[in-house]
Amino acid sequence: MKALQRVAEEFESWGNRTSFLPKSRDLFMLYLAFFFAPLLISQQSRGRSLPVSAFHARSDGMHTMITAHSGCEGRPDNSLEYVQYALHCGADALEVDVHPKDDGFYISHDPSDGAHPDLKDVFSLIRGSGVKVNCDLKHPGIEHAVLTLAQACGVDEQLIFSGSVSLEAIQDPAIRCRTFWNIESAMPALYAQCEAGIPLTEEQIRAAISLYRRCGVQIVNLYYGLCTQERIALLRENGILTSVWTVNDASCARQFLDAGVYNITTRQPVMV
């Protein structure tokens, strides 16, 4: 708009002397906007990334949640700078890694004695934004305490759990309904097997599904390398939705969207 105003100032006197341009400056601005705004927008958009919301739509007409992974787009991991960025990048949710401390919780991928942002400050930033926060719990047994803090901060409706959510905690509907349950929380041996590069068998997948169904799990959180269309479909047939992490490639994201996953976690919530 500033560019159009500058153009208007340059041509205002000339425009007043022509017969084919509007005499009113306001009308002249509209004239310029109509003819030149598309060109300006096109020029300014070159080299910019497209918001990941452009990828939300799936082939079935539904929409997939997009979660900004901690430290997305080059921001410092588990920082308030990252949180503020993630709130305005078009993602539906943002992820932070959560550890307990004597007087609450801090956000950091690894345990630390140093200074780290307080989870309460994260909750204060997201309150009322409509953006959800995925608390990736890095310590067992803190599910209910984090939920209590979220309730006190008025963000419990925005809260999601992933990470170390125990089999015992998942029995509580208040925890279960907001959890993307990691397969390693249910069956730790499977994660170690994957880390070693040993493919999961279909028998193992079906055993995991049986456990999910017994526990009433609604959404599972899987490493994207484990997710095939067949497995996503098998989970769906059993009433279980799929969240995948961490997808940083647009073409890969499109494949998961077309497969109908519930959530994609990515370090690139703005994809080129």
What residues fall within each predicted segment?
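Phosphate-group recognition and catalysis centered on beta-loop-alpha active-site segments
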Residues: 3-272
